[in-house]
Amino acid sequence: MVSGKYTYTDKQYIGSYLVDSKRMLTPTFLFNLMQEAAVNHADKLGAGWDYLRQFGHFWAMSRMDVEILRMPRWQETIVINTWPKGHNFLIQPRDHQIESEDGEILVRATTNWVILDLEGKPVQLSEYEEPLTRCEPELHAIKSPASRLRNAVPLENPIFKPVVYSNLDVNHHANNGAYVTWIMDSFDDAFHQSHDLSFLAINYLQQTHADDQYTIMKKETAEGDFLCSIYSQKNSVEVCRVRTVWKGRR
């Protein structure tokens, strides 16, 4: 069990609506559960959504690395731990560790968060210095910072799909989990039945909105290792870059 003055812990029962046909928590719901814990913790630390909104600001995730040791299963109860690790000029790193009730480490993750104004421009974190000092700089789920994915997959012969209602968040942007869903859906069922996700890195580059369309370009760089670029139809700009690593099922 992770413990510290500024850590946050939540428990979650894995119901049938959270799992796939393999009876395992889906990557999208894994992502959403960690994000919800981060949102709730930020609120408890005094720098949550409502507090920032009164100044015309909001939190946005910019990067995330997730190591999946074992995906939580249907009817399992998991313990979700999260904590901020400090901040610099524009970025607050935050870690997550998910465990079974018996203390088995299932998932480790590290993230970068920024504060944006309503025009999508970064805000200096010094504006919120006092609540952001409530952190655990020496506590790490993953010690290295979230990955910067440097290479894009070129846009070629795109087939665009619309951003739909279920993709939108409280800021009327495509929510972070929607990008994970889009990537997971780019692999067919046969692939999912024969592989399990073991690592995901995601870089958010720009926001996507309700009136937009997107497409995914994907390249296998090594066996089971895929790089994906998500492009917006508007000006053909890359909005998200994702790396997934998969292991074959026994």
Short names for language-model regions:
Residues M1-M61, R108-T110, L116-S198:
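Hot-dog-fold acyl-thioester-processing enzymes
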Residues K5-T9, E67-N151, T208-A210, K219-R250:
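HotDog/MaoC-like acyl-thioester-processing domains
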Residues S62-I68, I80, F199-Y204:
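Short structured motifs
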Residues L155, I159-T244, R249-R250:
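Acidic/His-leaning functional-site neighborhoods
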